[in-house]
Curated annotation (Swiss-Prot):
Residues 1-14 have a biased composition (Low complexity). PANTHER family: GRIP AND COILED-COIL DOMAIN-CONTAINING PROTEIN 2, NUCLEAR MITOTIC APPARATUS PROTEIN 1-RELATED. It comes from Mus musculus (Mouse). Residues 1-23, 1468-1522 are annotated as: Disordered. Homodimer. Interacts (via GRIP domain) with RAB6A (preferentially in its GTP-bound form). May interact (RAB6A-dependent) with ARL1; might be involved in GCC2 Golgi localization. Interacts (probably via GRIP domain) with RAB9A (preferentially in its GTP-bound form). Interacts with CLASP1 and CLASP2; recruits both proteins to membranes of the TGN. Interacts with STX16. This is GRIP and coiled-coil domain-containing protein 2.
Amino acid sequence: MEDSAPDAVAAAPSGTPKSKLETLPREDLIKFAKKQMMLLQKAKARCTELDKEVEELKSKPVDGGTDDIIKVLTERLDALLLEKAETEQQCLCLKKENVKMKQEVEDSVTKLEETHKEFEQSHRNYVKEIESCKNELMAVHSEHSKETAILQKELEEAVHKQVELREQLKSQSDSEDNVRKLQEEIQNITAAFEEQISCLEKKLEATSDEKQQEIIHLQKVIEDKAQHYQKDINTFQAEILQLRATHKEEVTELMSQIETSAKEHEAEINKLKENRVTQCEASENIPEKYQCESENLNEVASDASPESQNCSVALQEDPSAEQTVCDKVRQLEDSLKELESQHSILKDEVTYMNNLKLKLEMDAQHIKDEFFHEREDLEFKINELLLAKEEQGYVVEKLKYEREDLNRQLCCAVEQHNKEIQRLQEHHQKEVSELSETFISGSEKEKLALMFEIQGLKEQCENLQHEKQEVVLNYESLREMMEILQTELGESAGKISQEFETMKQQQASDVHELQQKLRSAFNEKDALLETVNRLQGENEKLLSQQELVPELESTIKNLQADNSMYLASLGQKDTMLQELEAKISSLAKEKDDFISKIKTSHEEMDDLHQKWEREQRLSVELREAAGQAAQHNSELRQRVSELTGKLDELVREKSQNDQSITVQMKTMTEDQEALSSKIKSLYEENNRLHSEKAQLSRDLEALQAQQDFAHKEHVAEFEKKLQLMVEERDDLNKLLENEQVQKSFVKTQLYEYLKQLRASILEENEEEDVVKLIQAVGESLVKVKEEEHNLVFEYDARVLELENKIKCLQEDSAVQCEELRTLVRDSEQEKILLRKELDAVTSAKEALQLDLLEMKNTNEKASLENQTLSTQVEELSQTLHSRNEVHDEKVLVIEHENLRLLLKQRESELQDVRAELILLKDSLEKSPSVKNDQLSLVKELEEKIESLEKESKDKDEKISKIKLVAVKAKKELDSNRKEAQTLREELESVRSEKDRLSASMKEFLQGAESYKSLLLEYDKQSEQLDVEKERAHNFERHIEDLTKQLRNSTCQYERLTSDNEDLLARIETLQANAKLLEAQILEVQKAKGVVEKELDAEKLQKEQKIKEHVSTVNELEELQLQFQKEKKQLQKTMQELELVKKDAQQTTLMNMEIADYERLMKELNQKLTNKNSTIEDLEQEMKIQKEKQETLQEEITSLQSSVQHYEEKNTKIKQLLVKTKKELADAKQAETDHLLLQASLKGELEASQQQVEVYKIQLAEMTSEKHKIHEHLKTSAEQHQRTLSAYQQRVVALQEESRAAKAEQAAVTSEFESYKVRVHNVLKQQKNKSVSQVETEGAKQEREHLEMLIDQLKIKLQDSQNSLQISVSEYQTLQAEHDTLLERHNRMLQETVTKEAELREKLCSVQSENTMMKSEHSQTMCQLTSQNEALRTSFRDQVRHLQDEHRKTVETLQHQLSKLEAQLFQLKSEPSTRSPASSHQPSKSLRERRTTDLPLLDMHTVAREEGEGMETTDSESVSSAGTHIQSLEQLLSSPDTKLERLAETSLWHNEFTKEELAEKLSSTTKSADHLNGLLRETEATNAILMEQIKLLKSEIRRLERNQEREKSVANLEYLKNVLLRFIFLKPGSERERLLPVIDTMLQLSPEEKGKLATVAQGEEESASRSSGWASYLHSWSGLR
């Protein structure tokens, strides 16, 4: 009974899923096992003592009767029963405690979960706060950009004002007043800027002072904390002090490094500030120097002008003063040159200062980068130290787990979580404040940069004024050109109207084509949408039918399972009935046997009554012996109580030691926390010092990565710890089971051995028996010791194995962590890809919007041009018509009036003549005498009449001609009117066409609006895609949670099975103990029978045995004393062994920790040395670079001085080339516009293609994932159904077994009760009667057999009950899991269906957009090719024209050179003494020749066409080819050695002209070379464009094939079957027959067809696996 108590105690904690034993560490478990061993040994010792007492009682002489013996035995039995009840109560108490512990553990788990949730919520809140901070920063940045834009606008306005003021000042006559006003304005501006700079410097100083105060305050706080914590640190142990000392040394080194770096950084910042201040002062002094020099130059020029006049007068008067004038001129020229060189030097200084500023900014950025890298290194070091600290903390936590309970662990975990949260909060707040400070400093820097930009803009302003003057000159020339063009406009009006009509017709046709294309595209879209809707409906129907199919299958499977279960249950019931019938028959037989035995027992009872009187005497004697034994027992009990007191004292001492150790551990943890706080403070200071130089985005991303990484590490460490604890618990449970089995085995062996010894004792003498017993006990003890030693060695070996397993598990967990990290990286890469796709989509959207705006602008421009042209045409037609009408009418009226006057005159003259004739006739008749006189008059009159008639005829002819002219004029008028009417009709038609165009434009705008709506739909769909992606991520998380739940359930199932096995093993041990107790009872009964039989013999040998008993008692007492001494020695040795083991473990742990820490320290020292070496190398490199910089600066100064001379030469050439460059600019701008259009279209096409490919990839991935999920769900559903059916069958079988077992139990209990009654009767009969030994032995055998049967039945019953409970719980859990999985499966199916529909819609829209883009691309390509050809022809014409001009200019220049050389020769030959007039003549002729030459060049430049070498071409890339061609400026700036030699040899006046001519030659040759290079580039771009066209054609074909493939998506099942047949068929004719089917389904290219044909014939089987068509399989079938 005592053996069962520890077993029950051991069974109690292992029965629960999460008991104290599971949570205890390894050493506590070992201690617990040792305590159990001690208790077992005590129980064994007590059993041996009881056996000895029984033997002593047997050996004592019997004075009284057997009643005393029976009473003693009954008392013993009662005591044993009481002890059993006590043990059972203890077991119940332990169970209750176990339940309480379970509840506490569950509460703690819930608390942990709550804290974890709170931590996650806080993490989310922090992420939101970071995002809000980012948004705020972005808003501040946008505000800052707005402010900068406003300042720039203000600057531009100020520049405009300055320009206006300068123009006003130029209009004024007094230049000196203007200069003074400008100086005053500049002084005001400089004063304002100086005030701003001073304010900014004050702000900087204030911020730096605040930062320094904060740093001082923090240092004070850190010093106070350090003093406070140093007091606590001094209380630590010596080993920990040594470790911390090394740690402190490292920290101080880091601090010193940080302080030095901070000081260096501050010094560099101060240097930069000083440099900037000096730069500002220098930049402010430069304009003042310029002004002073300009004033000096003006004064010199003003002084020089009267001197030159005086000189010229003096020269005219004196020819001898020529030399002095020449000297003065030369001096003035030298002074001018010096001033110009000073001017150029000042310019160089300005540029040098700007370059210096840029270099300093670059150096500052470089320093920032270096500090950022140093900060990252320090952070890495600090992280390593923190990791080392965390490892030490984990060691400390392990020690805590050895000394504390689970509740304390949970409290510590909660406290750590809270501290981490607070730390993160503080860290976030500090970083936000640091970021704001950095932003403020950045804004101040930007302000300073703006100041420098303002100064640069001022310089640009002056340059612009110079350019303005040049533009004014150009404007005057353009004005003259415009006047010429206006005269030509009247002539070109008719041509323009005709061209306009043709353009209108072309536009109308283009608009009509575009409308037709749009309508066709919309119709195709509608058709596709209808097909998509129809397919969706069919798909939904199929999905609904598919949802019904698994339900029907599940119902069929359930019915089949029920049928099989019912059949199995029927068969089992039949077998049970048969077994019950057999049992009933056997029980009937046993009943008959029992009745016969009862009869015999009655007879024996009568005999026992007769013997009772004899045994009463013996009982008196036995009572006396019992009294002695009781005294002996009381002594033993006193000893036991003393030993228990000692044990209690030892336990107290242990508890005190534990408490002291826990206190030390707490102090250690506090010290560690103090050190961690110090490290944190140092880390925060480091962050403050370096946060000003780090970028905001990097810090935020690093923080997020660190948080995620830390969170993941914590989770991984917790999981590792849990796994290790679970594994250790399982291993220890197994070890305990093995120990219990071994103990039970040893017990059974001992009992068997004792039985054998007792059997031998009955045969041999009693004296020898005692000695043998003692020897046997000693031998058994020796064996027990050996077995214990073996067990200890086995445990050590198992411990080593467990440690190896733990290491392997740690390695596996590290591998899993790496896999998880790779997964995280993959997810981040996917995020980056998605962001890139989003950026591409947004860029495409913006490009489309820009295209729309451009189209709108072009449409508006076209409409405006149409309107202007129509108004111009109307006005012109009206003016023409009115002019024609007025002119014609006036001419006709004048002619008519003239004719009328003439006619009237003629008529009047005729009338006068007629009157005169009549008068003459009358007079002739009256006076015939006067006939002769008057005949002459008549003749004269007749001649006059004839002449008049002739004149009248002539006039009539003229009148007829005039009439004809009038008729013609009328006809022309009619024709003009008709033409006017036709023009009006044409105007009306133009207006109608305009209306049509406006309607088409409206339709186009509606199309654009529909396109906008499509874009909005696209945006919505993209948003839906994002939502679906988020859903997919959620589903993935959900699946991960499910997998975790499954793992947990499997773990729980394994735990339950292990606990089940433990319970079964313990039940077996309890049953074995019960059997042993029953065997002991039987043995006692046997001994009692033997004693009763041998009472008669013992009466005779009473006296002898009393003497022998006394001697044996003395010997026994001596042996017991020896035995107790040996026990004490054993206990001491065991305790020493335990202490030695503990010390060894502690020493090994400490040695491991110290070794790890030393390794860490060595690694850190190595890293520090490496870093120092790198820093030294970098410093050396810095020095070398500084030296290089100095040398380079010297070289730059020398080069600048040389460049100035060349620039002076180049300025004159550039002034001549300005006009040609401006003409070339327009052509190049047009070309660049075309190229930009082409590039933008290319980019749009590529983006659209990339989008299409991305969508295809996404579709393929989604479909493959869908197929995988479907297959996975199907397999999981089938597995769950199988497991459910199996578990249901098991449950039914177990229920049937439990029913049968219950029935058997009821039968057995009834039989056992009857058997008890019989046993009592038999005992009563034995008191009265004495029966023969043969009958009693037979009854005993029968009893033993029956008891064995009862034990077996009990074991079976318990097993069946346990299995029933387990199966029921498993069934419930599996059913719940099955329901949840079914629900999730249905949800997943619905979501996949919706996703498929949405993706198909998106695919349709993308395809329609792709077709539109293709058509647009083809049109643009045609346009570009035509434009390219036109440009090529124009460039070739220009090149030819330029070559001709170049030849002409070369010839003219050669002529001029020959003339000049001749003149030079003449000048040299002439004597020096010559009049001043003669000296001035050649110069005048030279100047005249120069002036005559220059217009020739100007005419050539005017005659040239556009695009011949503008400065803007230098910056613009003409082609996309990789050939590098020098720009015009580079060609012009390149020095020419021949020209310099010519310049050195010739005189000053002649050198100037030659240089100009030579430079013109070189510039023209260079421009020709430049144009040749441009032609080559255009040809290269054309070649590239042709290659791109080929690629685009191939891609279009591939896309068309892909579209045709998508038609066969509906017949995937058929395609799958065809492919499977093709794969599994042997190569030959059957495979070749399937080729056309595969070709039609997959739309293969000719190469792919050829490869498939070779595969079908049996060639290249391995190569066909990676062929083109196989790569497309995964997008439909998910085979890959």
